[in-house]
């Protein structure tokens, strides 16, 4: 069954897979952590990213300690989706005991690249993105963690935003192209159309770095956006402080995907 977990609890799933794999492997386990956009320096204890702090801290609590019985190989796509295919090939060629990957696109590409290496993914709705056919029976070598209660949630977020900003006629959707053109974007477009609201882009394109965020938000402001919906992507989480600052600087009311944005002033 696909495991729907949050924060440090995901490490328990990873530790269980490591334990099962250890029956066939040496006492030293190799895990590849592959981030969509987070800097490699953040993929460690003390790196400042709350997700990896919880993840690696729980692994340590369960007895998996880097430098003792755990080797962690760290990779980042640096917000460049065009790099993902090359990154996937490199990681799979090194044949780690397990791959932990963030973002739906990366997890799907890993699934297509290997049927033997266990994959733990942090994704949006895994069924909607074609990672598994069923939550109850995902099959194959993929399990994971999803913070997405389903694409229908995006319609609800629009409802909440309209209550907070009742006169909003034009709403920006800040997300990268895969999400914009995929299930999330489709549901949100249908919801805005039904409400008589114009959904504004453009989507974020490679390389998804601070200049691209500034470009997209500037274009939304030029289109007279009344409010902003922030997509729940790994790339957005990497640049959450920048997103909050851009919304504040442009006096743009925003609805965010999780409380980490609120802690930064969103």
Region locations from a protein language model:
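Short hydrophobic alpha-helices and adjacent helix-cap/hinge residues
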Residues: 1-266
């Amino acid at each position: 069954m696909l495991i729907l977990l949050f924060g440090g609890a995901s490490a328990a799933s990873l530790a269980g897979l490591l334990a099962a794999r250890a029956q066939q492997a040496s006492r030293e386990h190799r895990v590849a952590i592959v981030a969509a956009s987070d800097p490699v320096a953040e993929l460690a204890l003390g790196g400042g990213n709350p997700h990896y702090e919880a993840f690696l801290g729980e692994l340590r609590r369960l007895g998996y300690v880097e430098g003792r019985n755990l080797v962690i190989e760290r990779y980042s796509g640096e917000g460049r989706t065009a790099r993902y295919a090359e990154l996937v090939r490199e990681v799979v060629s090194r044949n780690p005991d397990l791959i932990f990957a963030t973002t739906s696109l990366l997890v799907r590409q890993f699934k297509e690249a290997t049927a033997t290496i266990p994959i733990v993914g942090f994704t949006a709705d895994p069924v909607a993105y074609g990672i598994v056919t069923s939550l109850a029976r995902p099959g194959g070598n993929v399990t994971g963690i999803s913070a997405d209660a389903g694409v229908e949630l995006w319609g609800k977020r629009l409802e909440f935003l309209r209550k907070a900003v009742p006169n909003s006629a034009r709403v920006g959707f800040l997300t990268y192209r895969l999400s914009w053109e995929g299930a999330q974007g489709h549901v949100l477009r249908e919801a805005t159309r039904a409400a008589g609201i114009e959904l504004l882009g453009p989507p974020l394109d490679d390389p998804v770095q601070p200049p691209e965020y500034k470009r997209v938000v500037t274009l939304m402001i030029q289109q007279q956006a009344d409010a902003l919906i922030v997509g729940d992507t790994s790339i957005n989480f990497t640049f959450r402080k920048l997103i909050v600052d851009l919304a504040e600087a442009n006096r743009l009311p925003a609805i965010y995907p999780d409380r980490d944005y609120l802690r930064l002033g969103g």
